[in-house]
């Protein structure tokens, strides 16, 4: 599986600009013919606007699913939409969504091991399950940053 990992200069607390930049970079990455494109952690807000987190957070990843799921389908590429601050059930999670080539959201994962030295535990709710999914017939898993430890 050929993977394109996108590193982007995120604009702090500016999701509109970051969405536009992410979509542009995903399109540019397609020149390399990837099977999957991966965005970084907290790509839509930067890491992370503590005082405005709830205000800037996605609601059930609705915009990510609509815009990036649509882009995955348009480009015919699997897409790991990094992670975004996401409000679900009144709590804020650090959530990643995974889209297949048809734009279907095949997995959602909430970061389980929050990075205490950066204060994540004071703003995010930890996830409570592992993530496993299939892309192009391959079994895949997903971790976010500190989860790898």
Say what each PLM segment does:
Residues 1-5:
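Extreme N-terminal starter segment of soluble prokaryotic enzymes
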Residues 7-13:
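Short polar catalytic/cofactor-binding loops
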Residues 13, 47, 114-117:
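Conserved protein kinase catalytic core
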Residues 14-18, 121:
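Short, solvent-exposed loop/turn segments at secondary-structure boundaries
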Residues 15-16, 24-101, 108:
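Cys-nucleophile CN-hydrolase/nitrilase-fold catalytic domain and related Cys-dependent amidase chemistry
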């Amino acid at each position: 599986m050929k993977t394109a990992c996108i590193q982007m200069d995120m604009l702090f607390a500016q999701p509109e600009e970051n969405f536009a930049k992410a979509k542009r970079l995903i399109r540019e990455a397609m020149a390399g013919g990837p099977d999957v494109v991966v965005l970084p952690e907290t790509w839509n807000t930067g890491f992370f606007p503590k005082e405005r987190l709830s205000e800037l957070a996605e609601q059930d990843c609705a915009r990510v699913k609509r815009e990036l799921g649509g882009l995955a389908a348009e480009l015919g590429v699997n897409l790991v939409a990094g992670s975004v601050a996401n409000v679900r059930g009144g709590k804020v999670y650090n959530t990643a969504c995974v889209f297949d080539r048809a734009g279907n959201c095949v997995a959602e994962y909430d970061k389980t091991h929050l990075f205490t030295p950066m204060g994540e535990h004071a703003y995010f709710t930890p996830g409570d399950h592992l993530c496993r999914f299939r892309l192009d017939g391959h079994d895949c898993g997903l971790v976010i940053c500190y989860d790898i430890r």
